[in-house]
UniProtKB/Swiss-Prot annotation:
Pfam family of the protein (one): Med22
Cellular compartments per GO CC: mediator complex
Protein name (Swiss-Prot/TrEMBL): Mediator of RNA polymerase II transcription subunit 22
Coiled coil regions, renumbered to chain: none
Amino acid sequence: MSTPRVLPQSKETLLQNYNKRLKDDIRSILDNFTEIIKTAKVEDETQVSRATQAEQDHFEMHVRAANIVRAGESLMKLVSDLKQFLILNDFPSVNEAISLRNQQLRTLQEECDKKLISLRDEIAIDLYELEEEYYSSSCGQWDGVELPLCEAFHRQDSWGSPEMTSDPSHANHEVSDHLGSQESMQRHRNGSGTSEQS
């Protein structure tokens, strides 16, 4: 069981002052409102004329209404002072609020990390499947020579184009050109290697 906190003398005096202001303002509002209700009551004939009595009651109502407004403004100022007092002096509550906010942010961070890890694993699995599909498909091979992925898809699109399907000789010509370029590159490499050895 937590022991009640002991406030310093200055803070204790300040709280007592706040309490006194609260009681005085509430009493002022109640008393002035009661007097306004009494003033609104029509009395019997007195020595003062009715017109004079009406003016006097009217002035009294204005004064008491102003007192009620002043007491209300004082209460609003008291609320502001209490908020400031709590913000500046209630360190346990402030620390508790900070700890609660930190816990909420940590929970949110953990959820985001879990989602990112799950997304990373899914992307890795999909990428692995795409690589397996690419290297095991025929479009990834060209006469025993592996092609880059972009070139393989480009050639696959070329095979499926209407021009290639309508003109087989064009496809054969492209294949022969590719083989010729491969052979020329191989001869060039062999020739350069022979010259270096000599």
